[in-house]
Amino acid sequence: QSVLLKGYANEGHDSAHPDYADIGKRIGGADDMNTLMTEGAKYGAKFGIHVNAGEMYPEAKAFKDDNVRRYADGSLRYGWNWLDQAVGLDSIYDLATGEREARFDALEKLVGTNLDFVYVDIWGNNTGSSNDDSWQTRKLSKEINDNGWRMANEWGVANEYDATFQHWATDLTYGGYNQKGENSEVMRFLR
């Protein structure tokens, strides 16, 4: 049974993204999260976390002017408005500088392979780079897989190569038929 810890970070769901290693202290921190995962594994549970690689929140330590997304007129490209207003994260900058990979590596030092998968929210809707293309997606998957974790995504079309779970593709009440992933028989044949 896969269990998604959607609100593991900072103060809960969508809080302080993309500080992946900021495991909520008021919910027990890394020690309690590791206990949950090791004890849960005894019952067949495999745990994953919900992260964001396309938006960031002002309270995040990773938040800085160099990696925010802006429109041509200089205004910020805003994303989801949850605990605070998200701002688009320049995912190409994040990849090229190695900052995203370093944040995943910092998380790995805390949880290791007690963690089974990483669910990357919103990847594929172009909030991050305005082009979450296959090359970037494969690099993101590699950063996650190199730490021993499986890759999961929200959108069915976001990561057809490496995702082991896609939320919208499996949730009939989420989105229309065109949001259910790649349905091409030609593509299946070629792969």
Regions found by a protein language model. Give the residues of each.
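Aromatic-lined carbohydrate-binding/catalytic grooves of carbohydrate-active enzymes
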Residues: 1-128
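Active-site-proximal substrate-binding groove within the catalytic cores of carbohydrate-active enzymes
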Residues: 83, 91-116, 123-191
